[in-house]
Amino acid sequence: MAIVKFLLIWIILFVTTAALESVEREKLPAAASWTKTGELLAAEATQAAAATKSHVYAISNREVGQYDRKTGRKTAVSTGEAHHLNSGFFWNQKLYLAHSNFPNKPDSSDIRVLDPRDMRLHVLKDFGKSEGSLTWVVRHKGDWWCMFVYYGDQNHKSYLVRFDDHWQEKSRWTFPQEVLGRLGKMSISGGLWKDGGFWVSGHDERELYRVRLPKAGSVLEYVETVPAPFTGQGIAEDPLTGGLVGIDRKERKIVFSELER
């Protein structure tokens, strides 16, 4: 009887776990939506997008294209070596980009900076051999916040780390299962600070996840999953509208979006 009881409990746990994993991958209802408000063709729109009030920037593995917001015309392309550029964000009139040697091993990451006046890429901070690949970086509360990711069965090890201006680690957090369960074998590709927390994106899904810093512990607190017009990848804030810019990778487009509740 004890063996039968044990087997029944095991079967119930197995079925329940499988059902929960299935629900995680379903499209979740949301009380909000990031709605597309515009788009712009950009050959470099394969990794991420960023914006100023006058221009938008399409980011590919190796270069950044600058486009006039009003005309949609390409006005410049970056110079300087790059292997795998990821998300970018503007700070003090310069574009800061996560960069790594992905998919090569061992992992190596750095932050590159681009001045729109000369469109030259150069290294700001070289992490050397890193624990995971750097996919996005932002500034918040006077510190650097950097996302290092793992893929496949190891993607649960992906973490957000907070550095001071001397690149001393202050804290790090992993992601909640509500987010990890929707990434498949991929990981966190983009992120930014907004609305009292972080909006982050996956690699492919047309949705964004909002998380915030926990009051205690080392796991970020899940807030919500919201539909979005971006096909995953890097996102950035749009200073002109207060919305976001991202990409449609397949269509090679920069996509503009605003939050509707």
Residue ranges of each PLM-predicted region?
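Beta-rich catalytic cores
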Residues: E44-A45, H83-H84, D107, E131-L134, ...
